[in-house]
């Protein structure tokens, strides 16, 4: 048998019993991705956007983020963000350190609506440095405006990486 770890399902996989596709689902890897994000935030102000999430995996992400932020004693603010009235978001941005926005969802419409809203108001506090940390699934979205990703200094985290310094 041959393992095909990445890529789209196609007829080759369906028609050949000796081929199978192995890919790790997000519900298994989200903790690793969130840990990597938070490892990068020790000297930054985390702005965790609480979007009244209803999806089970998004709720798991939010819960894990809150637990880890508390456990690590990180500087963080949790904002009940609403794209229609975003002023409370601007008020909590700090000017003495970088603000890292965490949006714990993979729902394309939710991500797109909220980051477009944030990008449109971020200039109200030009002295605040802002970065958006996101999940690798965001790269597959068809409605995301690339300019918004750049304006928010977006970094996408993934478990699919090689550490060339690790000898094992």
Per-range role (PLM):
Residues 39-42, 92-98, 124-128:
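Flexible, charged surface loops at secondary-structure boundaries
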Residues 36, 61-64, 89-92, 112-122, ...:
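A short acidic, amphipathic alpha-helical/loop segment
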Residues 113-168:
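Extracellular/periplasmic periplasmic-binding protein-like sensory domains
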Residues 25-29, 93-103, 150-161:
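A polyampholytic, Gly/Pro-enriched intrinsically disordered region
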Residues 1-68, 133-144:
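Extracytoplasmic ligand/sensor domains, especially the bilobed periplasmic-binding protein
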Residues 68-96:
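A short, well-structured beta->alpha microelement
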Residues 1-6, 45-51, 79, 96-114, ...:
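Periplasmic-binding protein-like
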Residues 81-86, 106-108, 136-140, 162-163:
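Glycine-rich beta-alpha junction loops
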């Amino acid at each position: 048998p041959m393992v095909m770890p990445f890529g789209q399902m196609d007829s080759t996989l369906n028609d050949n019993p000796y081929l199978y596709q192995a890919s790790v689902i997000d519900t298994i890897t989200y903790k690793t991705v969130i840990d990597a994000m938070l490892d990068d935030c020790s000297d930054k102000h985390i702005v965790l956007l609480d979007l009244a999430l209803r999806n089970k995996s998004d709720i798991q992400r939010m819960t894990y983020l809150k637990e880890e932020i508390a456990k690590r004693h990180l500087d963080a603010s949790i904002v009940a963000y609403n794209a229609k009235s975003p002023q409370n978001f601007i008020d909590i941005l700090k000017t003495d350190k970088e603000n890292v926005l965490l949006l714990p969802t993979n729902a394309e419409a939710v991500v797109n609506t909220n980051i477009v809203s944030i990008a449109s108001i971020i200039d109200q506090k030009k002295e605040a440095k802002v970065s958006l940390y996101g999940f690798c699934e965001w790269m597959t979205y068809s409605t995301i405006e690339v300019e918004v990703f750049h304006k928010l200094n977006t970094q996408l985290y993934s478990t699919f990486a090689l550490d060339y310094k690790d000898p094992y």
